[in-house]
Amino acid sequence: MILGYVNNTYFNQAPNFSSNFNFQFQKRLTKEDIYFIVPDYLIPDDCLQIHKLYDNCMSGNFVVMQNKPIQYNSDIEIIEHYTDELAEVALSRFSLIMQAKFSKIFKSEINDESINQLVSEIYNGAPFVKMSPMFNADDDIIDLTSNSVIPALTEMKREYQNKISELSNYLGINSLAVDKESGVSDEEAKSNRGFTTSNSNIYLKGREPITFLSKRYGLDIKPYYDDETTSKISMVDTLFKDESSDING
């Protein structure tokens, strides 16, 4: 049962993450260190942390699950990196859209108001415009062909999806960036299963307290990430919601 959470007990609150971890546990956690999320009647009378550093897991009644250890990049660092890359893709896409809007250049003399009036009338939807006989549309209007903008926008969309997929995969979340009109086969959907599972398993050090719990009570608990089970649970939850809607409707 999850009792609650411990707030920053193992960390020194240093700005630099690499020097933030406290390797010397000065205090064994007790009931006063836990922010409980369970009802009061489920809170034990006494709480003492189980850990091999103190008495080789011979006493205590709760463990603390930790985030990834510092020899890996933290989730925040990964998210910040991909946030910068996604912002770059979004900015490039905005730049392409602006390029598509500016498709014509009108040549004229400096301070020539007639050409300004022409541009204003054209973009305001005037059915016809009056110009001087000296105006030559072939010579005075330069067409900036933007045929490459649409394919570039498609590539920007695909790159954005790829970055989102990379971020999800690095966090151990199964994600597929394939964009196909014909749909995605089951084999394609599972093609990155090994990569996401390996990234999920970098949390194994954070699961080490489970071994303390097993040693304390003589159990054999082996946690692992099961992507298929996670998907099935999501499907069952969706099905349950649909059935509830049908009954209530």
Swiss-Prot record:
One of its GO terms (cellular component) is viral capsid. SUPFAM superfamilies: Upper collar protein gp10 (connector protein). It is found in: Virion. GO terms for biological process: symbiont genome ejection through host cell envelope, short tail mechanism. Its main location: virion. InterPro entries: Gp10, Gp10_sf. It comes from the Viruses. GO terms for molecular function: RNA binding. Pfam families: Phage_connector. Keywords: Capsid protein, Late protein, RNA-binding, Viral capsid assembly, Viral genome ejection through host cell envelope, Viral genome packaging, Viral penetration into host cytoplasm, Viral release from host cell, Viral short tail ejection system, Virion, Virus entry into host cell. Homododecamer. Interacts with the pRNA. Forms the portal vertex of the capsid. This portal plays critical roles in head assembly, genome packaging, neck/tail attachment, and genome ejection. The portal protein multimerizes as a single ring-shaped homododecamer arranged around a central channel. Binds to the 6 packaging RNA molecules (pRNA) forming a double-ring structure which in turn binds to the ATPase gp16 hexamer, forming the active DNA-translocating motor. This complex is essential for the specificity of packaging from the left DNA end. Belongs to the phi29likevirus portal protein family. This is Portal protein. It comes from Staphylococcus phage 44AHJD.
